[in-house]
Amino acid sequence: MNTINEITATYQRIAEEGRSELNKVQNKIYRIGSLRLLLFVAGIAGIIYFWSSGWIVLTGIIAVTLLPFILLIKYHNRLFHRKDYLEKKIAINEQELSALNYDTSSFEDGAEFIDPAHLYSYDLDVFGPHSLFQYINRTCTQLGKSLLANWLGTHLVNKKEIESRQEAIRELTSELNFRQEFRILGLLYKGKAADEDELKAWAKSPSAFRKNVFFRMLPLLAGGINILCIALAIAGIIPLTVFGILWLCFVFASFCFTSKITKMQAVYGKKLQILATYANLLRLIENQPMKSPILKEVREWIGDEKQTASHSIQRLSKLMNELDQRNNAYIYATLNGLFFWEIRKIIQIEGWKEQYASELPRWLTAIAHMDVLCSLATFAYNHPDYSYPIITTRSFSLRAASMGHPLMNRDKCVRNDIDIEKRPFFIIITGANMAGKSTYLRTVGINYLLACIGTPVCARSMELYPAQLITSLRTSDSLNDNESYFFAELKRLKLIIDKLQAGEEFFIILDEILKGTNSMDKQKGSLALIKQFMTLQANGIIATHDLMLGTLADIYPDDIHNYRFEADITGNELTFSYRLREGVAQNMNACFLMKKMGIAVTD
């Protein structure tokens, strides 16, 4: 197992190798650019100077200047592509170095997925700035980004599914080169959020040209007539001008379809770059050996060796690129006059669509799954000190040793344990302000979520039964719905009760129940709620300032345990250990802090 220092050294080495090669490529680009300019100037000057020397001399000048100039264009373009590739390679390794120091600002934060009504994601800061999503997200496609959000928002609750995903993540964790290659190729052209829907909609759209017999026959008819005219002209039966007149007629006839084809080309043209990206990603998946069942399944989604998905998509990309040649007026006139070339290309594209439309969604799904699994594997690779949880079938169980919050600096994070071994069972945590209650709840929630999506967790060890996670930590007012803070929380608690009564299994995390009412009412309601949880065989953690809730452990000695986070007052100073201790809190700090700030407090 690598250490953090070894992982840091690996990223530094790859970035440095990239910078070294990039410097060489940039020098080549400069030299080739200079050579192209020299050849172009020499060619033009030679043609002008030797214009009257005959076609043999001019042909020789073109052969030694302009032809090499054209050949160098292709090589120059390859160098620019390599430059883009190396810049992405350097960037992603520099980003990982920053991420190891908890700077994830360069990654997308998934703020568009924030949902205050979600069962747990809003409370646990799963999406948004400085979120779990931003910390994990290494997706290089919009497909993968959306799927990662989906996985974080709808975690697994099946033991076999979680263990299968763990196996896939373990396998990819050791494949650093594959993961980085996948990410680089995806980032070269990431596309936009609507690409997937637009491609699927196009795949389902009708084939207007291919379904029409007239359009299918037109290229064959025009081509046959032109060949016949050329043959007759060569035989001296008809003058060549007949062929020329027919050719012009076909060119003008093609104008009748120009508007419709231009609209179709505009749609296709937007997909060229993203299709090329998808083809590259699919080819990478096809060539990667897979061992775990999930990765083998992803591989099966993209076809067999005889007709691979990458080859099929590359063929479509080639057809669309050929259609783009109609923008060249000379090619447009020449080929359309010969055999209605653009109609032929549209028919070929529609033929591809009819052949592979049913396969396209599976191919896109394969890309998305591999993208997300690579993200999760990078998370595992960057945290060699994390452990994969043991998934149990014993309901309910949640045991973890030395558990910390993954977004907190590893050198400053105070780690604590948790131990729930039966159903029903609740942990009630009391403590002063700022003592660590809320952080502990989020630590438990985030690690529980990580375990249920198949990744390692920030703990020395963990064992859990995967029930549905639900929280109520930061209920807020809703001005749009005319809802008070208190009523919003009641709706949340009602949701939990209804689902428990329906027989659903939950792991519940609550912070300060019934915050929006007076102390006596709050206490009475909180006691009643927890008693109902016991009746419904529920499990969870509740943090509170209300020490009276600690008396519930006397009523349910086997089902409720008290823990606390203390604020220690020594002399005139307030200190926090952030260590979870057994029992009910002894010290509260509100009055102490008010006095420290000069606010009068009557003893």
Positions of PLM-derived features:
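Alpha-helical coupling/stalk and coiled-coil linker elements that connect catalytic or binding modules
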Residues: 1-432, 439-469, 491-492
